[in-house]
């Protein structure tokens, strides 16, 4: 047993040593990019320390991947009572090769980060097709010599250390002469199993619902420190895995240039050669300002809130008395549709005015994309932005994505008491709303306008109805809607007591819908038909019947606020413009609809489904020219969005 424990100590010593060297690379990155630190980070020395702690966390994940096979080999050799020189030679070569790769990536990341301000990712493989040019670039730039030298120095030092450790621990194993009966071999198996289990847990990285993602490293408002904690190797591997996902393959609906030309005409966008083909400057009409003091904005995204749950849209049960009453007191929209059928689609489209791209989660990835949108424009105009979610911050990469794209603070399950967590999606709606009120009071007290986004969750399985709430219906799917509506009422009643209420615009929408009633076609309307209400005590109520979608919320709200900005997205101001139709997606389905026609296109099977809408009911009809405007409208918007994302033209400024 002593020889086995000697072997385990040897392997763990290598693991710790490797993490220390990875930390040295991080220290070099920190020093080389020190000038990127904000004044807040410079004044608070604990922030860099926390970034390094996150770095150890991420480095350990990669280390555990490497450690897993040696642990298995160690257990097998321990059971067989083999501790020969060949075993230690194997470990020396194995760790030298794999950590050599890790250190090569870390060294390469230093100049890469300095140039791109992001960690090395799968895009580097595009350079492999130009091997000569790439080699010339690396060898011809003297600034890269430091990274090359550090790599060679640290790797050489690590290999020498491995050789020393192998000799030392092998010699120790020879000096240990103890019998190794079968019961002790069983003990070795037990210890080894525990260590392997811990190693697998280390690979997962955390105890929460989701394994560790890049988002876990984001903890403050300093963009550099948020990225400092991410392991370059972790970032590279996960970005490669992201690229391999089928849903991330490039979308081909029509010719790119044709799509852009059509989108420019349909949206009346002249484009800006320095920004994007769809960029346009929006100049506010100052005389139409809602009020002298810039209003706060509270956006509430209601989980799975299909319009079909509301009496106003034909629901027979009284499920949403508060929303139905608010609908008549707001600027409300009768024909409003979600961009997709998942929460990430709704957030992405609502906040940044880009359409959902089929199944793809455009927020989720190790390489955090940058977008201009409602949060960034408001931030540029003096707003303080807050995001409140019920679940873990790294779910759908939300923490990292939103901190990168305009939000100052993100509140998530990690901030709430553990006893308030009711399921894998965190806390319930009423707790989220109660938690937000004092936070918003603190922000309002500063005199700075705020933009707060609250993402509810209760209307998502598994449904958890609080014991204190007594619904009137009998089915859980309906009871939870009653509860969600009740929680909203409680939030508004509490918010109405606050001094900031009258100077706040409230925007309420479903993040997407769900199946309500029977399916009338391949894609039931209830999945995407959602309510949108814009409420303020100083806004005249009105119902809009023109078509609109989540991509339109940003320009509509900025129009209400009378803010000048450069628009580079797919939204229209629904208070000043009208769409002839609306487009949206649902996983593999592209949809275009107007008052009389419905066009569905299955991207995977390339099947077209066409319906006539007569008296609110669908009648299947053959495809003909009358559906072409819907097809061209939908395809051109989606293909143009794919072009802008592919080429990084998602900001409202010159890159």
What annotation goes with each model-predicted range?
Residues 2-249:
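Transmembrane and membrane-interface helices of multi-pass
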Residues 21, 121, 131-132, 230-234, ...:
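Alpha-helix initiation and N-capping motif
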Residues 30, 86, 111-113, 165, ...:
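Charged, low-complexity, helix-prone segments enriched in Lys/Glu/Asp/Gln
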Residues 55, 59, 137, 164, ...:
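Residues that form generic nucleotide/phosphate-binding pockets
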Residues 85-86, 247-258, 363-367, 571-572:
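Short alpha-helical "patches" and their helix-cap loops
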Residues 125, 129-130, 231, 245-246, ...:
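Short coil/turn linker and secondary-structure boundary residues
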Residues 130, 218, 222, 229-234, ...:
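The feature marks either
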Residues 268-655:
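Solvent-exposed soluble domains appended to multi-pass membrane proteins
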């Amino acid at each position: 047993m002593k020889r086995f424990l000697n072997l385990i100590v040897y392997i763990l010593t290598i693991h710790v040593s490797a993490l220390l060297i990875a930390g040295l690379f991080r220290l070099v990155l920190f020093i080389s990019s020190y000038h990127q630190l904000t004044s807040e980070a410079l004044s608070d020395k604990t922030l860099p320390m926390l970034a390094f702690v996150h770095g150890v966390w991420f480095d350990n994940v990669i280390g555990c991947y490497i450690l897993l096979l040696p642990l298995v080999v160690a257990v097998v050799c321990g059971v067989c009572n083999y501790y020969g020189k060949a075993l230690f030679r194997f470990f020396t070569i194995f760790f030298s090769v794999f950590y050599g790769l890790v250190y090569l990536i870390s060294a390469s990341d230093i100049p890469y980060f300095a140039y791109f301000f992001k960690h090395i990712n799968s895009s580097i493989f595009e350079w492999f097709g130009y091997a000569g040019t790439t080699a010339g670039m690396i060898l011809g730039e003297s600034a890269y010599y430091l990274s090359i030298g550090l790599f060679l120095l640290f790797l050489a030092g690590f290999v020498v250390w491995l050789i020393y450790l192998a000799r030392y621990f092998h010699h120790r194993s020879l000096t240990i002469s103890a019998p190794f009966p079968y019961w002790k071999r069983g003990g070795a198996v037990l210890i080894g199993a525990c260590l392997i289990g811990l190693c697998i847990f280390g690979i997962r990285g955390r105890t929460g619902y989701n394994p560790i993602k890049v988002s876990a490293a984001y903890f403050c408002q300093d963009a550099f420190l948020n990225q400092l904690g991410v392991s370059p190797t972790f970032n590279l591997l996960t970005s490669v895995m992201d690229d391999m996902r089928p849903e991330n393959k490039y979308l081909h609906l029509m010719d790119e240039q044709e799509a852009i030309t059509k989108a420019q005409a349909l949206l009346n966008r002249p484009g800006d050669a320095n920004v994007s083909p769809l960029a346009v400057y929006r100049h506010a009409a100052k005389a139409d300002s809602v009020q002298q003091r810039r209003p706060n904005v509270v956006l509430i995204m209601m989980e799975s809130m299909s319009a079909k749950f509301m009496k106003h849209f034909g629901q027979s049960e009284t499920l949403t008395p508060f929303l139905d009453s608010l609908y008549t007191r707001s600027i409300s929209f009768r024909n409003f549709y979600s961009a997709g059928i998942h929460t990430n689609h709704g957030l992405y489209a609502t906040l940044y005015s880009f359409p959902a791209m089929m199944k793809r989660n455009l927020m989720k990835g190790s390489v955090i994309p940058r977008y201009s949108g409602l949060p960034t424009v408001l931030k540029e105009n003096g707003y303080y932005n807050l995001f409140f979610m019920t679940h873990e911050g790294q779910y759908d990469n939300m923490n990292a994505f939103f901190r990168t794209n305009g939000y100052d603070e993100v509140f998530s399950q990690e901030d709430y008491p553990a006893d308030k967590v009711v399921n894998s999606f965190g806390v319930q709606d009423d707790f989220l709303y109660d938690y937000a009120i004092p936070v918003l009071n603190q922000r309002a007290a500063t005199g700075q306008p705020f933009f707060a986004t609250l993402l509810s969750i209760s209307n998502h399985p598994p449904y958890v109805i609080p014991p204190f709430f007594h619904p009137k219906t009998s089915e859980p799917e309906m009871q939870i809607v009653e509860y969600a509506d009740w929680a909203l009422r409680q939030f508004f009643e509490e918010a109405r007591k606050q001094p900031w209420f009258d100077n706040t615009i409230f925007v309420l929408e479903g993040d997407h819908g769900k199946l309500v009633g029977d399916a009338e076609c391949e894609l039931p309307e209830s999945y995407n038909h959602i309510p949108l209400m814009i409420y303020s005590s100083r806004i005249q109520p009105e119902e809009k019947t023109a078509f609109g979608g989540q991509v339109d919320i940003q320009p509509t709200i900025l129009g209400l606020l009378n803010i000048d900005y450069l628009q580079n997205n797919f939204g229209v101001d629904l208070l000043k413009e009208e769409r002839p139709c609306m487009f949206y997606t649902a996983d593999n389905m592209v949809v275009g609809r107007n008052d009389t026609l419905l066009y569905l296109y299955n991207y995977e099977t390339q099947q077209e489904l066409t319906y006539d809408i007569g008296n609110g009911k669908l009648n299947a009809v053959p495809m003909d020219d009358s559906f072409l405007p819907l097809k061209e409208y939908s395809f051109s918007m989606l293909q143009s969005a794919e072009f802008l994302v592919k080429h990084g033209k998602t900001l409202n400024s010159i890159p």
